[in-house]
Design a protein with these regions (language model features):
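Basic polycationic patches enriched in arginine
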Residues: 3-4
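Short, Lys/Arg-enriched N-terminal segments with co-localized hydrophobic residues
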Residues: 7-20
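Class I (Rossmann-like) S-adenosyl-L-methionine-dependent methyltransferase catalytic domain
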Residues: 21-55, 68-72, 84-119, 123-133, ...
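Nucleotide donor/acceptor-binding cores
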Residues: 58-60
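Class I SAM-dependent methyltransferase "Motif I" SAM/SAH-binding loop
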Residues: 62-67
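Gly/Ala-rich phosphate-binding loop of Rossmann-like dinucleotide-binding domains
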Residues: 76-77
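A short acidic, Gly/Pro-enriched loop at the edge of an enzyme's catalytic core
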Residues: 132-140
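A short, conserved alpha-helix within the catalytic core of class I
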Residues: 148-160
Length: 232
């Protein structure tokens, strides 16, 4: 089954000075199983705060840069439909295997759509996913996407996400730490920056903040901040 999807955004992601954001960086992380960013259980902040979105069961949740997160299993098991976007095809192969699903695979523009049982994953560059491809989503859950992009790309990413998700409400989780102590990803995103990206479109509510046990990678004391974004 394994074949690498063409990286439509390779030039975009590889031209960030000083940061290795070439798609091959992420492919190699998955191929070498260097996926410390992958959590072995549903994210506790999702479990605790998802209700803040007030989304009825049966609605469709978009999870950008989803990897093979168990958050998808958690959402599906609670009766939601899920859409995701992920660069690494290997991650999505593993996701469907772990979910016990056999996907139907279809080329859509410069990405592939893997679909089965209330789940649609767009495999390829998220910047190649359009509003039409994605279809209707009722909410966004962003735990791993905004913090994966360096500062140079975060403005473009947030504008793109807002557009393709049609300004749907969002549960956003960010990291905040002294960036000089550790090179990302994940990158530090300040509360001020969250406002800069989203305050024009959304009413923002800061829900919670929790210390990262042991710091990020054992190098930097850090907090995870939880935000609720509702369309103005």
């Amino acid at each position: 089954m394994h074949r690498r999807v063409h990286d439509a955004g390779q030039l975009l992601l590889s031209n960030v000075k000083g940061i290795n954001m070439d798609p091959s960086f992420w492919h190699q992380r998955w191929e070498k199983n260097e996926i410390g960013f992958h959590e072995g259980k549903p994210n506790p902040l999702l479990v605790k705060h998802f209700h803040e979105l007030s989304v009825a069961k049966g609605r469709r949740i978009f999870v950008p840069l989803c990897g093979k997160t168990l958050d998808i299993f958690w959402l599906l098991s609670r009766g939601y439909r899920v859409a995701g976007a992920e660069l690494s095809q290997l991650a999505i192969e593993q996701l469907f295997i772990e979910l016990g699903m056999q996907p139907e695979i279809e080329a859509v523009g410069n990405v592939e759509q893997w679909s089965a049982n209330n789940l649609d994953i767009f495999v390829g560059d998220i910047f190649a996913v359009s509003e039409k491809m994605l279809g209707l989503v009722d909410a966004v859950y962003d735990r791993a996407a905004l913090v994966a992009f360096p500062e140079d790309l975060r403005t473009r990413y947030t504008a793109h996400l807002t557009k393709i998700a049609n300004k749907s409400p969002q549960l956003l989780i960010t990291y905040e730490y002294d960036q000089s102590l550790m090179a990302g990803p994940p990158f530090s995103v300040s509360n001020e920056e969250v406002h800069r990206h989203y305050a024009t479109t959304y009413d923002l509510r800061f829900i919670a903040s929790t210390e990262v046990a042991g710091g990020l990678k054992g190098k930097a004391p850090a907090k995870e901040n939880v935000w609720l974004l509702k369309r103005k």
